[in-house]
Amino acid sequence: MTSAGGNPQPGRRVPAMSVSEQAHTAGRVKDLGRTVEFSWPGVYFEGRFRGTGLGVVLDCAAADYDVQVDGTTVATLVTPGDTTHWIDGLRDGEHTVRVVRRNDTPGDTSTFGGFVAAPGGAVLGRPAPRDRQIEFIGDSLTMGYGNVSGTRACDPEQLRRTTNSDVSHGALTARQLDADYQINGLSGLGMVRNVAGICPDVTYRTYYDRTLLNVDGDVWQNPGTWRPQVVVVNLGSNDFSDLTPGEAWTPDSLAAAYRTAYGEFLRELRTRNGAGTLLVAVGFDRNAEHVRQVVEARNDAGDSGVHYWYLDQSGLDFLGCEGHTSAHDDRVIADRLAPFLRSLPTGW
């Protein structure tokens, strides 16, 4: 899928400026100067340019991207490969551009090489970052798993094409609050147990510190510009998925381990972000009471900056792939979560 007027060209053009000079991003990236590498879903790059067209420089054979000009999606790039994709036929003048990674492909690394102006135009300096920042931590519900499918029955190809982190409830909530955001979501993983007991040697926390998810031992280097006022954690749907034969867990041992690990994770987030960041722990379905207990324990231990929010399922149709939340559901959740975040002592 590409826009009318879009023109993919093999091979990457080299922009005149480094990526960090011409593009604003809040996502986790490894800055290599002329390019940046990234893995997490929902990572976005925002720029400004003058002229009638723009080239988007990408090297990614695994993920899909939306290209938005002046707030409108003008192209969806499906596993574009090593290319400069041109958007042309625009009115002559100043424009904004946004490139966003739609889906999760944790086994692959993506490369963004910036923007190239069409003849007679120019790439302008990057937009200013927003004052507000929110991090969303979670699983498939956080990253928009199959949310634009319109059906629960999806094959793997349909799942890849219909996952859109840019309309996940986290992205929509952040836009309502005019906040930059990170969608640090990984499908299928939990706090201590993954869906159906798969991959028992790893959990979400195995990968959380990374920039590049497929690189063992990789650690994200915060450039100093990421200081979220709010971190929203929604992990537990996979932990409490039905136990399978042969697993060592019992319901009681799983619940106890989950609560312990969740409390440890909140303490780690507090150390990472400092006392001023509010931590919001989301209760959903089978994990709700356990999360509430963890929040209560953190409050009793003196951390009043940890808050509980219950994700109400009323009005949700779960028409995403495999019964996940749909784009409709993501809008409903965002319309409920944004007012809650406004009610917290952030000054928002």
Predicted segments with their positions:
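Conserved SGNH/GDSL esterase-like catalytic core that processes O-acyl groups on lipids
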Residues: 40-42, 106-108, 152-252, 285-289, ...
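Alpha-helical cap/lid subdomain in secreted, periplasmic
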Residues: 70, 206-348
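Conserved beta-strand scaffold positions in the cores of enzyme catalytic domains, especially
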Residues: 136, 181-183, 308-310
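A structural signal for isolated positions on well-ordered beta-strands in alpha/beta enzyme cores
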Residues: 98, 135, 182, 277-279
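Active-site donor-binding loop signature of nucleotide-sugar glycosyltransferases
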Residues: 79, 186, 311-313
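N-terminal secretory targeting modules
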Residues: 1-137, 141-162, 348
